[in-house]
Amino acid sequence: VPDAQSQWAELLLATLAEAGIRDAIISPGSRSTPLVWAACQIPSLRRHALIDERSAGFFALGQARVTGAPSLLICTSGTAPSHYYPAVIEARQSGLPLLVLSADRPFELQDCGASQTIDQAHLFGGYARYFELGTPVAERAAVLGLQRMAWQAVAAALEAPRGAVHLNFRAKKPLEPASLITSEVTPVLRPARSGYRWRPAPPTQVSPEDLAELTERWTQSRCPLLVCGALSLQDSPSAELVARFARLSGAIVCAESVSQLRFQLDPSTADVAICDSYDWLLGSPQWSKQVAPDLVLQLGAPPLSAQLGRLLEDTPGLELWVCAETGWPDPLLQSARITRACPTELLLALCRALEARSPAVPSTAQRLWRDAGTRVRQLVDAQLGRAFGEPEAVSRICSRVPAGSLLVLGNSLPPRLVDRYCPAAARRLRVLSQRGTSGIEGLIAGALGAASQAQCPTTLLCGDISFLHDVGSLWAARSEHTHVPATGWPLVIVVINNGGGRIFDQLPMAKQAGDHQRFWTTPHALDLRGAAALYEVGYSRASDRETLRIALESAYARTDVSIVEVVVDADSARARLSAVAAEVDTYLRGVLSAS
């Protein structure tokens, strides 16, 4: 049927938009022409152009981390969609909705040496739901099927467990719509229906049996901990609810920065034990033995802190409960129970149950954790004031991130340094991280995608190797390609340049590797201003407290993308870690001997 293919594509894109798709990230190619042209006909669809599919994939995930909704990726055939694979895996592991719409060659060109043709069916294996869209047919049943698959794809991306969905569109030549050549085009494919009524399932409620048992355990515990690991903006409970639960239960709250709670909770709140120094406290063997918890409730992903991990693994008699709507976030295999519930719903139910009982009386353990945590934070701050290095740089950067803004943390050292050196504070920061697979790929692209939706200043804090790994994603910073600069808000990319991947210097292998250590740390002597010049974004360099202050003030005064390169000594993080740990251990030994 003449022009049926273009009308098929237009109907598909219109239905996806009706189902809630608001952003399309398009990578160039010929076979995807019907899809791209169709996307350009929908006024409600914001279109972004990225030449690299890997960057496009993580740009879409950055948007999803902020909005909770899937964005649409469009690409040509062949190896093009395979570059989405890392983002598709991250979507599955992080529970992020994502739609991939790949163009493909028709069936008759498969397995015969046709150019740019591979087997794209089920390309992403078990990491994505798959829909074969077939070829255009001018029949009502076929049109109904196409519209149903579009709605079903969006629903599948949003239903638990959230993740990626792959739609495969087989296009034949001519790829251009007939309307570009002649005005005499007869509509042959009309919508068979519109307005599907679909809504995601409500949050999972805790079972009465789990609630009764956990309430009983909590009231009997002498030293309960609430551990908050990585949580999305959509899944994290409010700071007010966590504080209410801590007050009612006597829980000691240990919140990682990526939980959304570390920079939302107020540590000065009366009758609430918020300990932001847990990583230092648990680094002391004596503390871990004498003031160890007997009950831990974990919200979100497993904790990033190695000290918390060792506590969960090595403490005799410790009972671990894990709250998870889907998945099995217990890599140490230590949990007594995986309770299927939304974190907010679980805490609300526990609060109601605990309110019916006698109020919790602050225990000796709770007072020790709170008082020691406060003093340890003072010791850490004093150490930071002695010399400028990576820990102090991270602390000062976080303190200057505007209140109420978005902070994107890279992987490797940055999130660990933030948790060690940045105190909890009620600054209303939203914190994004790529903790699904904990890889360094796509960090710049993800931050740019998040910034396109955030409607506030955005800061990416990452290491130099992470930056170099994704430097091509700075293409998305150009206003003619995406909507990022048009937001009018600054995106500040802060790069800690310590000359390589220094987290590997903290591993046991570093002592034996000798000259072979370069295969882990990948040292370099690059100046990052060249990258800024290539992509025409702002740039400044800092190497001490004053130049860092000036660089950040200048970057946040802009309304576009800029890079702040912070040059630090390669060994500063490891050296400061050893010095602070020794001082903290000495202090805690005194506290424990006195108690």
Question: Language model features by range: what are they?
Answer:
Residues S102-A153, A255-A372, Y556, E565:
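Glycine-rich, acidic loop regions that bind phosphate or pyrophosphate groups
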